[in-house]
């Protein structure tokens, strides 16, 4: 079992944890439909960068 040889200071512990923060997802609004979607992803209506790339009717 691993056991530390010397105690880590509060500063060293906090510096290690400085990159652990979570951030919110970057959301975009589609210009043509107004749909909210993740950046660089197709919107729920099948539109990407103003163009219809997925026909929702064909999938069903």
Curated annotation (Swiss-Prot):
Pfam families hit by this protein: Ribosomal_L32p
Protein name: Large ribosomal subunit protein bL32
Biased composition range(s): Basic and acidic residues: 11-22
Span list, region Disordered: 1-44
Molecular function terms from GO: structural constituent of ribosome
Domain of life: Bacteria
A biological process term (GO) from this entry: translation
TM regions (residue ranges): none
HAMAP family, alphabetized: Ribosomal_bL32
Gene Ontology annotations for the cellular component aspect, listed alphabetically: large ribosomal subunit
Gene source species: Pseudomonas putida (strain W619)
Keywords for this protein: Ribonucleoprotein, Ribosomal protein
Family, similarity comment: Belongs to the bacterial ribosomal protein bL32 family.
Record NCBIfam families: rpmF_bact (TIGR01031)
């Amino acid at each position: 079992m691993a056991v530390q040889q010397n105690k880590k200071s509060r500063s060293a512990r906090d510096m290690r944890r400085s990159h652990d923060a979570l951030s919110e997802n970057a959301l975009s609004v589609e210009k043509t439909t107004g749909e909210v979607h993740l950046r660089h992803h197709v919107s729920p209506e099948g539109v990407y960068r103003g163009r219809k790339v997925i026909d929702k009717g064909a999938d069903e």
